[in-house]
Curated annotation (Swiss-Prot):
Subunit structure: Homotrimer.
GO MF entries: amino acid binding; ornithine carbamoyltransferase activity
PANTHER family: ORNITHINE CARBAMOYLTRANSFERASE, MITOCHONDRIAL (PTHR45753), ORNITHINE TRANSCARBAMYLASE, MITOCHONDRIAL (PTHR45753:SF3)
Name by which UniProt lists this protein: Putative carbamoyltransferase YgeW
Organism per entry: Escherichia coli O157:H7
Pfam families noted in UniProt: OTCace, OTCace_N
Length: 396
């Protein structure tokens, strides 16, 4: 049973949070109360919209988007979040800007932010670069605000980097809270974050890393499964281990999809490229080595093809708790016989859970809006209370 807006506001007001003083770049940099605040603010915004109450807290202002990789769900979720709050979106096309002519990050960050209240960045292609770039932008914004160049400090949101995908994992957590009733009900639940076969290579590590980095915060039993050699960034695996110890949950790694699925309450079969491959790919991309990239792709596709049995089938789902585990995916899934010949999941399994995955995805606009709101307002609970009190109809 979802809480009412008034109940959510009461919960938000009881939390100790400093999100208004920092950017949301990695989930494990935030305290449990700060994570709960984002979830509660998102739930309140979603409930207000369902009741046809306007949530436009900004009368003007821009939300800047910087996408250095392709995106559908996150791009539209970010645009939706901005509109939800009353901000207009402007996409920065780096190829058509002075960045292409050598303009510095410091200068660009300030030049685009005179009337900006939010900047969302996706930069996931280069290991060791995406999150670092976001922090460089953040430092430039801090300096611009401190020096009086900017009248306000825009909220900076990580829309996916090389390390984490916080808007995705937080949307996933919001969906799990909705599905199971509360965060408390997630304690002891087994979630299997598993690699799955895909006919493509080079998929980022940030989704599985985001899942193991966040779900271990809430006492869940997290199992990471992948074939030998498909490791994630070692530092993030250590984060997951430490999180599990602190929360009273567990974290383990296995090399069997069947073992991971056994008695799981939630399964998240998703392809990713091995950490070592992504390191090589980054070096080749930086060197603009097209022949090297082609050779690496050929090698990786051959390696992937050895593991076609890592496939989320009806038989695999039968291994889960009562054969009814919740299937999750960040989308788009590689559906065998639909979007590809052989992929991550069978058509039957995906169709059974298709609506569930759409509901999972539906949380992302509200999560992004909650991150922006929490960065811009020290007391989001009071702001939501005001919106509820005024109760201006969104559509008349």
């Amino acid at each position: 049973m979802m809480k009412t807006v008034n109940e959510l506001i009461k919960d938000i007001n009881s939390l100790t949070s400093h999100l208004h003083e920092k950017d949301f770049l990695l989930t494990w940099e935030q305290t449990p109360d700060e994570l709960k605040q984002v979830l509660d603010v998102a739930a309140a915004l979603k409930a207000l919209r369902a009741e046809n109450i306007s949530t436009k807290v900004f009368n003007s202002g821009l939300g800047i988007s910087v996408f250095r990789d392709n995106s559908t769900r996150t791009r539209f979720s970010y645009a939706s979040a901005l509109n939800l709050l009353g901000l207009a979106q402007q996409d920065l096309d780096e190829g058509k800007s002075q960045i292409a002519h050598g303009e510095t990050v410091r200068e660009t960050a300030n030049m685009i932010s005179f009337c900006a209240d939010a900047i969302g960045i996706r930069d996931d292609m280069y290991l060791g670069a995406g999150n670092a770039y976001m922090r460089e932008v953040g430092a430039a914004l801090d300096d611009g605000y401190k020096q009086g160049v900017l009248p306000q400090r825009p909220a900076l949101v990580n829309l996916q980097c090389d390390i984490d995908h916080p808007t995705q994992s937080m949307a996933d957590l919001a969906w799990l809270r909705e599905h199971f009733g509360s965060l408390e009900n997630l304690k002891g639940k087994k979630i299997a974050m598993t690699w799955a076969y895909s006919p493509s290579y080079g998929k980022p590590l940030s989704v599985p890393q985001g899942i193991i980095g966040l779900m271990t915060r809430f006492g869940m039993d997290v199992t990471l499964a992948h074939p030998e050699g498909y490791d994630l960034i070692p530092d993030v695996v250590e984060v997951a281990k430490n999180n599990a110890k602190a929360s009273g949950g567990s974290f383990r790694q296995v090399t069997s999809m069947e073992e991971a699925f056994k008695d799981a309450d939630i399964v998240y079969p998703k392809s990713w490229a091995p950490y070592k491959v992504m390191e090589q790919r980054t070096e080749l991309l930086r060197a603009n080595d097209h022949e090297g990239l082609k050779a690496l792709e050929k090698q990786c596709l051959a390696q992937n093809a050895q593991h076609k049995d890592w496939h989320c089938t009806e038989e695999m789902m039968e291994l889960t708790r009562d054969g009814e585990a919740l299937y999750m995916h960040c989308l788009p899934a590689d559906i065998s016989g639909v979007s590809c010949k052989e992929g991550e999941v069978t058509e039957g399994v995906f169709e059974k859970y298709r609506i569930a995955t759409y509901k999972e995805a539906s949380w992302k606009p509200y999560i992004i809006a909650a991150m922006i709101l929490s960065r811009k307002y020290a007391k989001p609970g009071a702001l939501l209370e005001q919106l509820l009190k005024e109760a201006q109809e969104r559509v008349k």
